[in-house]
Amino acid sequence: MEKSLQLEIVTPDKVVLSEQVDYVGAPGYEGEFGVLPNHIPFLSALSIGSLYYKAGGKTRYAFVSGGFAEVSDNKVTILAESAERAEDIDIERARKAQQRAEERLKAEREKIDATRAEAALKRALARLQVRNAA
């Protein structure tokens, strides 16, 4: 039996991460799920949030913004709309995005797309959470 699995995080622009890991925890659409080596195959929609993985006794974090996770043959493939490793997150940029989203939500509701503003706020908060966890 395998003792590790391959984790790949891919966006439309690039491969964010490709690494052998011991465990993956991801923000599924219906709630967080975890994957250990030799897990049964499955496919899950992802929500905006924190993905974490363990390798060599260390826990590392990444931000994912929606997409899908595929688990098959000791490989976890994350196909995300956007993703960043914790160490690559620009805290100042995330804080500014949070501030812009909060200001849009406070504006008159008729003049904004509240759903888009809420999603932007959720992305900014998740990025900050991931960066602070690292």
UniProtKB/Swiss-Prot annotation:
GO terms for molecular function: ATP binding; proton-transporting ATP synthase activity, rotational mechanism. Pfam families: ATP-synt_DE (PF00401), ATP-synt_DE_N (PF02823). It comes from Oleidesulfovibrio alaskensis (strain ATCC BAA-1058 / DSM 17464 / G20) (Desulfovibrio alaskensis). CDD domains: F1-ATPase_delta. It is a peripheral membrane protein. InterPro entries: ATP_F1_dsu/esu_C_sf, ATP_synth_F1_dsu/esu, ATP_synth_F1_dsu/esu_N, ATP_synth_F1_esu_C, ATPsynth_dsu/esu_N. SUPFAM superfamilies: Epsilon subunit of F1F0-ATP synthase C-terminal domain, Epsilon subunit of F1F0-ATP synthase N-terminal domain. It is found in: Cell inner membrane. Produces ATP from ADP in the presence of a proton gradient across the membrane. F-type ATPases have 2 components, CF(1) - the catalytic core - and CF(0) - the membrane proton channel. CF(1) has five subunits: alpha(3), beta(3), gamma(1), delta(1), epsilon(1). CF(0) has three main subunits: a, b and c. This is ATP synthase epsilon chain. NCBIfam families: ATP_synt_epsi, PRK00571.1-3, PRK13446.1. Belongs to the ATPase epsilon chain family. HAMAP family: ATP_synth_epsil_bac. Keywords: ATP synthesis, Cell inner membrane, Cell membrane, CF(1), Hydrogen ion transport, Ion transport, Membrane, Transport. GO terms for cellular component: plasma membrane; proton-transporting ATP synthase complex.
